[in-house]
């Protein structure tokens, strides 16, 4: 149940971003007041304009997104390591679930204490998986408002796109959904077990991105395409699921070979005793 609650929380947070994004509509400039408008949205816009090589706002958004992803790289790497540790603890967690299978409050309290102790001993935070999303939500909100509320960016174009309007050909929403699926699917491949909520997330998130992409500014779809393409490449480079699976298969093969060797070593002794 907790896994489904976490899934609903993440979906709700994404929706909340765009509800809040629509709240501010007044143009943002150097004379704007308020911490959000003056120091976040305004400076996001300035950064995008600075990176808009040749006056192309689209290039500015692409470069800005890459800079943000590079800054977040240590956090994402930490998240990946933490998730792998959590997966390695699954056999011990299952043993705890069997030990404290009763649903009475006292047993469940003991289970939670043992679970937290296991996490603490292995330096694992099971909620770290939500952290990158929580960090990126205000970035997406600020980017959306910078494009829609700063006149110089609002009038920007890129290739066939008017950046303050949805992509008329749906190319960016489709690419955003494809790269979102690729990044989430590759991440789930490296896990020992994929629970039901993660399987659902593999399809729910791309669908949400697509449907929001067909109705929101194409600047946001461009951000999603670049961000999730970067995430896909990062996963293949730093947490390659194909390599991890091969390593696990090799480790399992070696473990079985050691077991067979021990059995063969014990067999002559048993025969000798019979004589």
Swiss-Prot record:
Disulfide bonds: none annotated. Residues 1-22 form the signal peptide. A lipid is attached at residue 23 (N-palmitoyl cysteine). One of its GO terms (molecular function) is membrane insertase activity. Keywords: Cell membrane, Chaperone, Lipoprotein, Membrane, Palmitate, Protein transport, Signal, Transmembrane, Transmembrane helix, Transport. The chain crosses the membrane at residues 53-73, 127-147, 169-189, 206-226. One of its GO terms (cellular component) is plasma membrane. It comes from the Bacteria. Residues 249-266 have a biased composition (Basic and acidic residues). CDD domains: 5TM_YidC_Alb3. It is found in: Cell membrane. A lipid is attached at residue 23 (S-diacylglycerol cysteine). Belongs to the OXA1/ALB3/YidC family. Type 2 subfamily. HAMAP family: YidC_type2. Required for the insertion and/or proper folding and/or complex formation of integral membrane proteins into the membrane. Involved in integration of membrane proteins that insert both dependently and independently of the Sec translocase complex, as well as at least some lipoproteins. This is Membrane protein insertase YidC. The gene is yidC.
